[in-house]
Design a protein with these regions (language model features):
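Extended hydrophobic leader/signal-anchor segments used for secretion and membrane insertion
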Residues: 2-218
Length: 218
């Protein structure tokens, strides 16, 4: 009768001796319904607390009301705002500010675009409608029409280090830093920077929501 051959590797496995002092492997106990519910509850509570803290101290939602930021923003647009304490404001940012420093109330809050920041000199040509900052003509593809001025802020205007100059993208239908009631805005009055357009309002042309507008503002 032929002798059965054994695989040396298997023999090694079979005769392997557990090292001295090593603890035996424990079988993983199956998860109970209680432990599963506990894990899900813990994750849910953590998520809710994180969202509450985020919206309390970090971000918040606001609605646009008025035509001053067309064609970038429209009435009914819902925006996600990053709190000012986390912002380093720069020219081109779309920001939310309160107008409490205005000589006459303009609105509780305003949504505008920063055109110039502290230390810069801004000027508006009354003939061509071009805006210059520190002598450089701004490239402003976002504005609805050229910028024209009426009696108000005197140009050229050099900003203090803690000021910004803001204007609406719908330049000729916007109360902003060109208006002597508001003027240059102290950065302490900036509530935050617009991060995202979350929900679009209806555009005047189509009276419908254009969902392709959702995203980061430019």
């Amino acid at each position: 009768m032929a002798e059965e051959k054994r695989d040396p590797a298997l023999e090694t496995e079979e005769t392997a001796v557990q090292p001295e002092g090593a603890s035996p492997k424990k079988k993983k106990e199956p998860e109970t319904l209680e432990s599963t519910l506990y894990c899900w509850t813990q994750a849910l509570v953590t998520a809710v607390v994180s969202v509450v803290l985020l919206f309390t101290f970090g971000v918040r939602l606001i609605s646009v009301n008025g035509p001053s930021m067309q064609n970038t923003l429209y009435t009914g647009d819902e925006l996600l705002i990053l709190n000012s304490m986390f912002c380093a404001f720069q020219a081109g940012d779309v920001v939310v500010l309160n107008a409490y420093n205005a000589e006459e109330p303009l609105s509780e809050t305003l949504v505008k675009r920063i055109v110039a920041v502290g230390g810069q000199t801004v000027d508006v040509d009354p003939v061509s409608g071009t805006v210059t900052v520190d002598g450089q003509v701004l490239d402003e593809p976002y504005i609805k029409e050229p910028t024209y001025t009426t009696a108000g802020t005197q140009f050229p205007l050099t900003l203090a280090e803690d000021e910004v100059f803001v204007m609406g993208d719908n330049r000729n239908h916007s109360s902003d830093s060109r208006d002597i009631r508001l003027g240059a805005v102290n950065v302490g009055y900036l509530q935050g920077k617009v991060l995202l357009l979350l929900i679009p309002g209806a555009t005047p042309e189509t009276e419908a929501r254009d969902w392709s507008r959702i995203g980061v503002l430019r």
